[in-house]
């Protein structure tokens, strides 16, 4: 089986969301879904908002990133989460 590397873009609900706590929550979520977190970074967006990017490594399987993406979208402080890059290694 191949290894999948995905970049997930996560938008918090507001600028008041604690950035480091959100990054730690996302890292734990990835690792609790049989995947490895290869990095979490943030970029300023506008008006105090920021975007968080999560690099995920996992074995290729049916359903792919869907369970992780859905779990991220279900988090209380997350407005949206979507896979923006996907590649096989």
Swiss-Prot record:
Cited InterPro entries: eEF-1beta-like_sf, EF1B_bsu/dsu_GNE, Transl_elong_EF1B/ribsomal_bS6, Transl_elong_EF1B_B_arc
Gene name tied to this protein: ef1b
UniProtKB keywords: Elongation factor, Protein biosynthesis
SMART domains (UniProt xref): EF1_GNE
Similarity section: Belongs to the EF-1-beta/EF-1-delta family.
Protein name: Elongation factor 1-beta
Pfam families, A to Z: EF1_GNE (PF00736)
Job of this protein: Promotes the exchange of GDP for GTP in EF-1-alpha/GDP, thus allowing the regeneration of EF-1-alpha/GTP that could then be used to form the ternary complex EF-1-alpha/GTP/AAtRNA.
UniProt-recorded Gene Ontology molecular function terms: translation elongation factor activity
């Amino acid at each position: 089986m191949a290894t999948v590397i995905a970049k997930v873009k996560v938008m918090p609900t507001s600028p008041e969301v604690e950035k480091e706590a959100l990054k730690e929550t996302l890292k734990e979520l990835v690792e609790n879904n049989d995947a490895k977190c290869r990095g979490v970074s943030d970029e300023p967006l506008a008006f105090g908002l920021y975007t968080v990017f999560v690099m995920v490594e996992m074995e290729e399987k049916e359903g792919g990133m869907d369970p992780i993406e859905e779990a991220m979208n279900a988090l209380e402080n997350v407005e949206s989460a979507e896979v923006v890059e996907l590649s096989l290694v």
